[in-house]
Amino acid sequence: MVQVFTNYRAAQRGTELHALAALLIEKNIKVAEKPVAFNMFINDAIAFKMKPEQLLYFSEYAFGTADAIIYRPPILRIHDLKTGVSKPSIKQLEIYAALFCLEYEPNLTDLEFHLRIYQNDSVLEHFSEIDDIVHIMNKIRNFTKLLNEVSKDME
């Protein structure tokens, strides 16, 4: 019971921190230069002129919200703020990159993916390969098609 409550409070705090970060980015308000992920996330998003809390939508089965995103050809930059203690995975950001490509259909030829996860006092930076993102895009298309067919069969 205590663990459930603790997890709930941590999730609630994470939601509040994401909302604060989005507001600070939208208002272009930088925060203290400290090696704290929250501050680095906000300052970097402002410096790169990123849009906070951007919905990426391909279908009713495939969507997500990027914490901060900007596309300036040929670079798609996605940053994610993690407020919990679980080990971060770049896979979520690669899915967001795939959703972006499916929704906005940029020229994939020279596209670069600059992905960052901000957690605790560190930043994990990753540069994904186009083949990895295209593979995820194909999975999303296939699963969406399958779920659409299953949904029609259930009507």
Per-region residue spans from a language model:
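Internal, Lys/Arg-enriched amphipathic helical interaction segments that engage polyanionic partners
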Residues: 138-146
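Secondary-structure transition/hinge residues
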Residues: 25, 29, 104-105, 148
